[in-house]
């Protein structure tokens, strides 16, 4: 009975989350854009339709999204790095529901990383201190109805995620595809009570490509479904900014020599935000960090 009660509670929380997300994206564009914060690379608040594009592409993805970020205590050494979460005054439950989902998925992500650590021959708790107060992001995404034939853009072009791992709840609408080892695209459909877990580029880099990044895309629906929205809520699990992403020694050998230069997760994130079009290269990594400190 307790497990049934817990399952029912999870269903309610998931429905409540998607309800709040729909409510937000249904707000007038002018209202949503009032929550678009300049100068922080889209790390908190609203990011408008077509702003983000995949690495190596110029066409903006056919989506708009929101970012919930880390909730740190004031005495955390990372507190000054993170912009504050943006409060939506029109929706009194939106931020609380988002925070609860963020913290539940973060907790789940820690357990996934522990399992991966054991698989990699590391201490089970290797990732724990890097994940605590990490720069993780919960991103509710809205792919609006398609109103005309897109020239080259799709809902989300093929890409790998930046972070360590991504936890993705069953989306409201199909379209997610992942690329298998043969280079073929296959549909990735999670049920409402399941999670899709992707390996991100940071973990791929840290393991010297022993764990390969999950390349995925969100394709446009068939014409008869153009009038439908798609909603998705990925949780991007990032480490703290000073985590070294140097290739692990036990992932380097004669058959798999070191493939990546040493870099911290913060520096790597900056490079990728430039690639995505979320910040301009004229904004240096140190300037961005200074702005984040000021924003807090």
What annotation goes with each model-predicted range?
Residues 266-289:
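C-terminal helix/juxtamembrane-tail motif
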Residues 6-103:
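Non-heme Fe(II)-dependent double-stranded beta-helix
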Residues 49, 63-71, 141-143, 170, ...:
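Structured loops at beta-to-helix junctions and adjacent beta-edge loops in soluble globular domains
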Residues 1-2, 8-15, 286-293:
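Conserved small/polar residues in nucleotide/adenosyl-binding loops
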Residues 57-60, 132, 160, 190, ...:
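Extracellular/periplasmic catalytic domains that process cell-envelope and extracellular macromolecules
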Residues 37-43, 71-74, 97-177, 219-225:
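Conserved double-stranded beta-helix
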Residues 21-32, 70, 105, 109-113, ...:
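A generic secondary-structure signal for well-formed alpha-helical elements
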Residues 6-7, 127, 153, 168-263:
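Catalytic core of Fe(II)/2-oxoglutarate
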